[in-house]
Amino acid sequence: GNFDENLVYVNDIEIFRPLLVRNAQQEGLSFINSDMVGDIVFSSGGFDAKYGDKMSSVLDIRYKKPQEFGGNVSLGLLGASLHLEGLIGSRFTYQFGYRRKTNKYLLNSLETQGEYNPTFNDFQVYLTYDINEKSELAFLGNIADNKYNFIPETRETSFGNFYEMLKLKVYFDGKELDRFSSLFGAFMYTYKPKKDLVLKLITSAFSTGERVNYDIQGQYYLSETGLGFGDDEGLERGIGTYIEHARNNLWANIYNIEHKGVKIYDNGNLSWGVKYQYEFIEDRVNEWKMVDSSGYSIPSLPDNIGIFDSVFSPQLNNVFKSNNAIASSRLSAYVQKQWIFSYDYGQWYANLGLRAQWWDYNKEFVPSPRASLSFKPNIKQDILFRFACGMYAQSPFYKELRDEKGNVHSDVLSQKSLHFVLSSDWNFTMLERPFKLMSSVYYKHLWDLNPYYLDNVQVRYMAKNNAVGYARGLDVRLFGE
């Protein structure tokens, strides 16, 4: 899936990610701080009903509870990090992590040459306090401040085939100044009235302010490279200028409260949960682009500069202006039951769950049934086989509601997928070290898709459920020490 189609959890808390960010170049630091991680579970599909409403995959992270004092410091050309952990008395544990990163040296290898100055800063804290033998209180906090400053200079690209190779060279003026700042905090109260019953209450808040500003002029020169037969090297094909302008600002506040529970039986367990989420998003878009070919601003198709076709209605320039504010509420709930059947030849695990969600903005209610069957044979090898299937509905977030011109559409529905996944987990020892091989084969039928295109690695949606598709593949991962 793309940047928006994957779930990320830390200690049962769903993590939100920037909305305007351009994937890979500007994301910088992911939320996950590897120094604080105790366990990782990843599923490329067919995940349980207890996980949320995304189409593609889920990454479930568990931050550890330290048993003693420790820490580490890392320094390098691409950044630095500091991590401290420990406990105070027998009830209170803490983890602190600070990270600073720059990928300017990596970005300097891109086709667009210039002065890249991205800086990403992140501070996280995870605290736990054992109130008594039955109760625990935990806090997870994060402060992130990401800046992406870029002054482009030149870009050179070659394309075509053996008989006609073309070279495009662009000289730039201007710069881009982006900033993404966010605050995240979550409290989790865990209560165990009995050994076979666990109850959790989770509340969290996420606030982000995102700014994308740029004024960039590019003067381009298109020529032949002379690699084909009989071509004149350096023959000019065309010159022109284009200007891109943006003043985009977005503010988002997301609050939620959630209850989860697990009842353990001799032959399985029962899990349930219910969640309420309130969102307020304010967005201001002011973008335009002008293309000037040889001194003339002529109407043209976006993908065929200088070619006019009266069948279409091309725009003289691309102008996106909007001022949107959305307040909405979401409700979701799930219940799932696991059965364990033991025989002489092995153990069977059956899991059946139902998840449902409702959003008051588009008035859509979507149920999502999910099921899985696993088998662990009684043999010397520690191996588990699993088949899973289910329906997954990704309710649109603000980004999916906004079309390429900045207009917001309230009739956009959830994107839906049907998963079929066959997987295996094999734990073994090699070179006197523990290893784990995880593999899966999957097929996903997709419908009510909201098409998007990549604009300089930024995902821009069409805000229409007018596509179908599929995803299929083989996923193999090897873990070792």
State the predicted function of each range.
Residues 136-137, 141-192, 207-232, 245-250:
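Flexible loop and strand-edge segments within Gram-negative outer membrane beta-barrel domains
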Residues 78-100, 113-151, 176-205, 265:
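Transmembrane beta-barrel wall of Gram-negative outer-membrane proteins
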Residues 200-204, 414-472, 477-481:
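Membrane-embedded beta-barrel scaffold of Gram-negative outer-membrane proteins
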Residues 252-254, 267, 275, 319-445:
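Structural signature of Gram-negative outer-membrane beta-barrels, strongest in the C-terminal barrel
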Residues 1-14:
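Extracytoplasmic beta-strand/coil segments of soluble accessory domains associated
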Residues 231-235, 244-347, 466, 471-473, ...:
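Outer-membrane beta-barrel transmembrane domain signature of Gram-negative proteins
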Residues 13-42:
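Short acidic/polar hinge/loop motifs at secondary-structure boundaries
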Residues 46, 63, 77-79, 100-104, ...:
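Transmembrane beta-strands of outer-membrane beta-barrel pores
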